[in-house]
Amino acid sequence: MTIGIYGGSFNPIHQGHLALGRWLVRHTLVDELWFMVSPQNPLKPAAGLLDDNARLRLARLAVGRSQRLRVSDFEFSLPRPSFMADTLAALRQAHPEHDFVLVIGADNWHDFPRWHRPDDILAHHRLIIYPRPGYDIDNTTLPHGVTLAATPLLDISSTQIRRAIASDRAYAGQGLHPRVWKEIQACGYYTLTD
């Protein structure tokens, strides 16, 4: 089975993440997509990052009972910081029956040379890149095994959502799955006092 690994902080997971996952499985680029909740992205600051289990719960609420979208806490048991090269190697060892494909945004592709062991990732895995606002990718320059998917360009980010929640009492959960928004409200996540 071909499994797309979509790693991220998902702080919080939003409709753009879900739309991308649904698009990838609908267009048969992957059989399943696993949202790999990362304890800490080594290239991002930890400030404002919700607890691992809170982000995992929000992701599970968003995905619900989907048969082809899954949420994984696989990285929670790995040494920190979480490097995708290590995660993918551990996944290959734990699940040799699957073909793991890394799913990243165009913004991450621009930073990919700074990743831990990027050549190892490219040697063992195909990559699917999805468009992000402000990051152009020349499809003709991509290495073998790297595909630019023609996914819809969604201008939504977790950072925008966190800022909106913290600054606007009238924010109504735009861009969030209703179950996620309800949990964020109930727990008081992303408020100025959080």
What are these regions (language model features)?
Residues 1-194:
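Nucleotidyltransferase catalytic core that binds NTPs
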